[in-house]
C-alpha cells in the first residue's frame, strides 16, 4: 500500500499509455509488467526483426521501429545502452510528447541527467537495481523488479509530479 498522499497517488492512475524504448532484459521486463498492471505499452526498437520477435513474445501491445509510435504516450521509459542515452537520436527526442514523463533505466546517472534534463522538461533519471546476465529481446520476464531497489536521482529542476509518477511506478512493480 502506498504511503504517498492521495492526490499524488492519482498521478499513477491517470497515466496509462507507456512507451518503452528498447526491449531487452530491462525494457522487455517492464513491458510485460506494465501490461499486467493494465497499461497500454508501445515498444520502440532499432530493427524490424527485433520488433517482430518482441511482438511475438508479447513484450508490448505494439512494437515499431518508428519513434512516432511514442506520440500518445504519457510515460516513456528509455531502456537504452548508456552510449545511446548520452547521444540520443534526434528522431527519438523529437517524437517525445512534451507532456509525457520520461525516465531512463541506465546505471550511470549524472551524465544522463545532464543530457536529458536539457532535452525534455519532465525527465526523471532513475535506475532499477535489477538484472541478470542475459540480454536482448529474449531476456525479459515478468517480476524482475519485485523486491529490488529502484533509485531516482532528481535535481532541483525535476518536475515533482514526474518524480512522483516514477516513484509510484517503482512501487507498483514491487520495488
For each feature predicted by the language model, list its residue ranges.
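NAD(P)+-binding Rossmann beta1-loop-alpha1 motif at the extreme N-terminus of oxidoreductases
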Residues: 11-67, 71
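Alpha-helix C-terminal capping/helix-to-coil transition sites in glycosyltransferase folds
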Residues: 71-72, 98
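N-terminal Rossmann-like NAD(P) cofactor-binding module of classical short-chain dehydrogenase/reductase
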Residues: 76-77, 103
Amino acid at each position: 500500500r502506498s504511503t504517498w498522499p492521495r492526490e499524488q497517488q492519482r498521478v499513477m492512475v491517470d497515466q496509462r499509455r507507456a512507451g518503452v524504448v528498447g526491449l531487452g532484459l530491462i525494457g522487455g521486463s517492464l513491458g510485460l509488467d506494465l501490461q499486467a498492471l493494465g497499461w497500454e505499452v508501445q515498444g520502440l526498437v532499432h530493427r524490424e526483426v527485433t520488433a517482430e520477435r518482441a511482438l511475438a513474445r508479447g513484450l508490448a501491445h505494439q512494437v515499431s521501429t518508428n519513434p512516432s509510435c511514442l506520440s500518445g504516450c504519457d510515460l516513456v521509459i528509455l531502456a537504452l545502452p548508456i552510449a545511446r542515452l548520452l547521444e540520443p537520436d534526434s528522431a527519438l527526442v523529437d517524437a517525445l510528447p512534451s507532456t509525457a514523463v520520461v525516465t531512463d533505466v541506465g546505471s550511470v546517472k549524472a551524465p544522463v541527467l545532464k543530457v536529458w534534463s536539457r532535452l525534455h522538461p519532465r525527465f526523471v533519471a532513475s535506475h532499477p537495481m535489477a538484472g541478470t546476465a542475459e540480454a536482448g529481446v529474449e531476456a525479459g520476464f515478468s517480476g524482475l523488479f519485485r523486491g529490488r531497489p529502484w533509485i531516482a536521482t532528481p535535481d532541483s529542476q525535476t518536475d515533482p509530479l514526474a518524480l512522483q509518477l516514477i516513484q509510484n511506478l517503482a512501487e507498483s512493480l514491487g520495488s
